[in-house]
Each structure stands twice: as structure tokens, then as C-alpha cells.
């Protein structure tokens, strides 16, 4: 049998402690632990518990930067239609409360960064939906031009606080599930090409307001769908369905590398919360590791790609709203393994 040196051209290193940043495939002998160790990479993603948000709520809007150590979360709602206006900022370790929204609301769309964010539409509690839009400058919220169509639970918030896209959504009263899409240029909203399928509470991701993906959601019959569409800046095209039809899911990433997680799936007599996580590679959806706590209405968050990082903030379980936060690390994360002779 060939030796390690014959294969790799060098002896195994002897180190007193594990290297700080080992390269995948690197092998060493840890003289303190008296074991041989090696560096590999994870083959599946994983969710880990992070610091809980200060205010328990569901249906929070967010603005997320990559990595997910820079997050702004705002608004939200609790059972009974009670809406929230609180704004909180996450630095990767703790949540800090900042200035409230001028108009408390839940199920609004976010977008932008933690210093330049957008809060679009939402649910006010009875009587229903709003078209009010607010812009965040890092310290306070200011009202800007309203949406053309008041709504909540829109897929979107794709882009910045000066170039944004929202798609679909729900308005009440009367109850209407929308296909309309609106685009923000920093001054006003313009209606652009409609979705092929009306929907609300869908997942959305994208690099900019001209390159987006809308996944699953609820249809006019108020059941979860699996349909997915992509946006090229002009029109929507249907692509491969997700594996688990659902509504109230969250998402992150880009048009060609997307993560979706959580939501509600059909059940009897009521829908059931799910922790199902799926990854889009530009061609197909693959199931990955579930959330630790199944939920819907968890504020979304994603890194630059779905295989890097994402965050699930608060949300609603079958037992009620929660403050729990989970962070996602995708496949390919560094992993140190200990070799044994067994």
C-alpha cells in the first residue's frame, strides 16, 4: 500500500494544535491530542440556533447583507391581528432596538441594507392592507411614495431602497390575490409585467430588481402552490417547481442560487408548519437540512448565494409566535475530522 508521502510528496505535519484555517484535504498529527486529523468540507447545509430577537412576532420584514451578521428587522404581527412597529438590528451576536416604523404593520416587504432599507405595504390589522412605503436612512424612517396597489404578503423586496421590486400579494377588503408587479426607482412605483400565476406569501430572491425569482406561495384558492417564476426585467417565465408546495415560506440568495425554507403545507383540518429547506442551482430544486423549529412567516435572509448563509428570524409555529432565530451555513463549510483505526 502506498504511503501518505508517496501519494502527496510530503510527510504528515506534526502540530501542537489544529491549524486556524486548514485547507480541504490537509492532514496533520495533533501531538497534544495524540491523534491524526484532517480537513474536509460538509456535504449538506445546517441550521444553528442564534440569539433570539427582542420582540416576539411573526411576519417581519428584513434587509439583509452578506454575511448575515448585518441584518435589519422591522414590523411584524402577532395572533389576533396585533401589528408591530419595532425595528431591530443584528450584528451577528446581539439584537439592538432602533427607531420604530411610523406605521406599525405586519407582512410587509423589505429590501436594501441595514443603513438604507425599504418597508413596502403590509397589513394594518382590521381593516386590512396598506400601500404606505417607508425608507430607512440608518437612524429613522421617512414616508415616501405609496404603492399603486395597497397589499401585503407580496413576494419581493428584491433590490435596494432606491431600486426595488415587489410581486403579487394579498389585499383586503375585498380579498384579492394579486399578480401585479411594481418597480421602485427611488421616487415612484411603476407597474410592470404581471406574474403568470397570482400568488401571495411567496419566497423571493435576486441580485437586483431586474433579476429575480418568485417561488411557491398561496393561490386565489388559499392553498399552497409549488410553481416558480423568474424575472428578466421585462417578463416572467415559469421554471421547475419546488418539491414541497407551501405558503408563508421565506427565502434568500440570487436568481440562480436560491434557498427557501419554512412555510405552511396543506393539512387536515388546518395547514401544518414545515421546516423544509430547498436549494435552487439554476436548474432544479434539491431538499436539504430542515429548520430546527418548523415555522412560517419567519423573516427571510440570504447571503450572496444560497450555499453560503441565510437567517430565519422569529415566525409562527403551530403553538403561536416565537422569537427564535436560526442561521444557515451551506454545504462546503470547513470540517475537521479525527481519524481512528476503527
Go through the PLM ranges and name each one:
Residues 1-342:
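Polar, enzyme-active/binding microenvironments
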Amino acid at each position: 500500500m502506498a504511503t501518505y508521502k508517496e501519494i502527496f510528496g510530503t510527510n504528515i505535519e506534526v502540530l501542537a494544535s489544529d491549524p486556524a484555517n486548514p485547507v480541504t484535504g490537509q492532514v496533520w498529527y495533533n501531538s497534544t491530542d495524540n491523534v491524526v486529523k484532517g480537513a474536509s468540507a460538509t456535504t449538506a447545509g445546517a441550521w444553528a440556533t442564534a440569539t433570539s430577537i427582542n420582540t416576539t412576532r411573526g411576519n417581519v420584514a428584513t434587509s439583509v447583507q452578506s454575511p448575515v451578521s448585518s441584518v435589519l428587522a422591522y414590523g411584524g404581527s402577532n395572533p389576533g391581528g396585533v401589528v408591530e412597529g419595532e425595528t431591530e438590528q443584528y450584528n451577528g451576536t446581539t439584537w439592538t432596538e432602533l427607531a420604530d416604523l411610523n406605521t406599525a404593520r405586519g407582512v410587509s416587504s423589505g429590501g436594501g441594507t441595514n443603513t438604507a432599507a425599504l418597508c413596502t405595504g403590509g397589513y394594518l390589522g382590521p381593516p386590512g392592507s396598506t400601500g404606505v412605503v417607508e425608507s430607512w436612512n440608518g437612524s429613522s424612517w421617512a414616508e415616501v411614495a405609496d404603492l399603486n396597489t395597497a397589499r401585503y404578503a407580496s413576494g419581493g423586496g428584491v433590490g435596494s431602497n432606491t431600486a426595488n421590486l415587489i410581486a403579487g400579494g394579498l389585499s383586503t377588503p375585498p380579498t384579492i390575490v394579486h399578480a401585479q408587479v411594481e418597480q421602485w426607482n427611488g421616487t415612484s412605483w411603476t407597474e410592470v409585467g404581471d406574474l403568470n400565476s397570482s400568488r401571495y406569501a411567496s419566497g423571493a430572491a435576486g441580485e437586483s430588481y431586474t433579476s429575480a425569482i418568485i417561488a411557491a406561495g398561496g393561490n386565489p384558492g388559499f392553498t399552497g402552490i409549488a410553481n416558480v417564476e423568474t424575472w428578466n426585467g421585462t417578463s416572467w417565465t415559469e421554471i421547475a417547481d419546488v418539491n414541497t408546495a407551501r405558503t408563508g415560506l421565506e427565502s434568500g440568495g440570487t436568481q440562480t442560487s436560491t434557498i427557501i425554507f419554512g412555510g405552511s403545507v396543506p393539512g387536515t383540518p388546518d395547514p401544518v408548519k414545515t421546516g423544509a429547506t430547498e436549494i435552487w442551482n439554476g436548474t432544479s430544486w434539491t431538499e436539504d437540512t430542515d429548520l430546527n423549529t418548523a415555522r412560517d412567516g419567519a423573516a427571510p435572509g440570504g447571503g450572496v448565494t444560497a450555499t453560503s448563509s441565510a437567517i430565519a428570524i422569529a415566525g409562527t409555529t403551530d403553538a403561536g409566535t416565537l422569537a427564535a432565530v436560526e442561521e444557515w451555513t451551506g454545504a462546503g463549510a470547513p470540517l475537521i475530522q479525527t481519524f481512528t483505526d476503527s
